[in-house]
Amino acid sequence: MTIGIVGRKSGMTRIFTDDGLSVPVTVIEVDPNRITQVKSVETDGYAAVQVTVGSRRASRVTKAEAGHFAKAQTEAGRGVWELRNEAGEAFEVGGQLTVEAFEAGQKVDVTGTSKGKGFAGTVKRWNFRTQDATHGNSLSHRAPGSIGQCQTPGRVMKGKKMSGHMGAERVTTQNLEVVRVDVERNLLLIKGAVPGAPGGDVFIRPAVKLRNNG
């Protein structure tokens, strides 16, 4: 069992079961997560573990970050992430989290940043239906239609679905199955698609809403 781990999405492929079934999987490269800080309820008000992965050039590390990594006696990574430790597991600064904490068949939640789509209209962004192609409609085929009432309330309600920036948001896909754990190559093979583009950072943790799809 683990509180979670940070990895990088490599892409998608497929593997075959012993019965010859094709299973689509996402390959996630998980370098050892180095623990840079352990937070507790007594000192920080909540229990969490701060980790870093990868490496960064010294010229790209601020003095504050350099001091933080030096205190943890670990190499500066490309970023820091916090993993909540609500179960109260014991961790030490300088330790590592690896793929060995996961096992095949385990259900996980994967969080990442979705692909950015730029400025999108309501048809693409919110799945609105298009208006008539003919019958007097010349300019409003993909227009959203009315966005409110008249003088009462005299404004557009907050949260109204309209055109705007689509994607590039934090997204979590729940209850994905770990198909294979490759300890030698630090890889996790997870059934199905996970949020984000290849090369993006993702956060994997045990599923919070366990569901039996069998």
From Swiss-Prot:
Entry's Gene Ontology BP terms: translation
Transmembrane segments: none
Modified-residue entries (N5-methylglutamine), positions: Q151
Superkingdom of origin: Bacteria
Keywords from the UniProt entry: Methylation, Ribonucleoprotein, Ribosomal protein, RNA-binding, rRNA-binding
PROSITE patterns to which the protein is assigned, alphabetical: RIBOSOMAL_L3 (PS00474)
Entry keyword annotation includes Plastid: no
Location of the region described as Disordered in the Swiss-Prot/TrEMBL record: 134-161
Post-translational modification as stated in the protein's UniProt record: Methylated by PrmB.
Molecular function terms from GO: rRNA binding; structural constituent of ribosome
UniProt xrefs under Gene3D superfamilies: 3.30.160.810, Translation factors
Cellular component annotations (GO), alphabetically ordered: cytosolic large ribosomal subunit
Family label: Belongs to the universal ribosomal protein uL3 family.
Subunit relationships: Part of the 50S ribosomal subunit. Forms a cluster with proteins L14 and L19.
Function noted in UniProt: One of the primary rRNA binding proteins, it binds directly near the 3'-end of the 23S rRNA, where it nucleates assembly of the 50S subunit.
UniProt name for this protein: Large ribosomal subunit protein uL3
Taxonomic source organism: Teredinibacter turnerae (strain ATCC 39867 / T7901)
